[in-house]
Amino acid sequence: MFRRSPGGKANMSGRAQPARAVLFAAMASCLLSPAAALAEPPTAVIPKQTIYPGEKLDASMLEVVDVTNPDLRDGYVRSIDEVDGMVTKRTLLPGRVILASALREQYAVERGSTVRLVFNNGGLTITAAGSPLQDAAVGDLIRVRNVDTGVIVSGTVMADSTIHVVAK
């Protein structure tokens, strides 16, 4: 609670005064710390040339620059390691920051190709040929048509381009 002092100013209780001094000292030490003074400016990755949707990114197409705009919103790529090998979803213009939402992982399976379906249930393993009904990256849940029977099943794309079928 606040109390009015005889001078007319609002004053906090006597116990809060030392707490205010400790808070001020902590804020001053954070602002004046050598770590804050030595912190590197933020960086961003920008394209050197126009990159069109579907192109695979590599380090030769990109460069890292210091961010000079303090109002730049978060969500942009900060290092080339984050994007090396990814594929663009939309056109990237030279000199503009690359948003993480404009990139995707490279597809492990493509629509219409032939893949191996694997179904595991306990000790039983069944494999069959399948055809994905959509493009998908590793870890995506997609629908696949069994080439032999025509039955459509759902499964998860694995790193070796097989699809592990989900039990119904």
Curated annotation (Swiss-Prot):
Alphabetized Gene3D superfamilies for the sequence: 2.30.30.760, Antifreeze-like/N-acetylneuraminic acid synthase C-terminal domain
Enumerate the UniProt keywords alphabetically. Answer: Bacterial flagellum biogenesis, Periplasm, Signal
Q: Does the keyword Signal apply?
A: yes
Q: What Pfam family is a match, any one?
A: ChapFlgA
State the source organism's domain of life: Bacteria
Q: What is its main location?
A: periplasm
Gene Ontology, cellular component aspect: periplasmic space
Does the record carry Signal as a key word? yes
- Please list which residues make up the signal peptide: 1-28
* GO BP annotations listed: bacterial-type flagellum assembly
The record's NCBIfam families line, in alphabetical order, gives: flgA_cterm
PANTHER family under this entry?
A: FLAGELLA BASAL BODY P-RING FORMATION PROTEIN FLGA (PTHR36307:SF1)
Q: Which family does it belong to?
A: Belongs to the FlgA family.
Q: Output this protein's name.
A: Flagellar protein FlgA
Q: Which organism is it from?
A: Rhizobium meliloti (strain 1021)
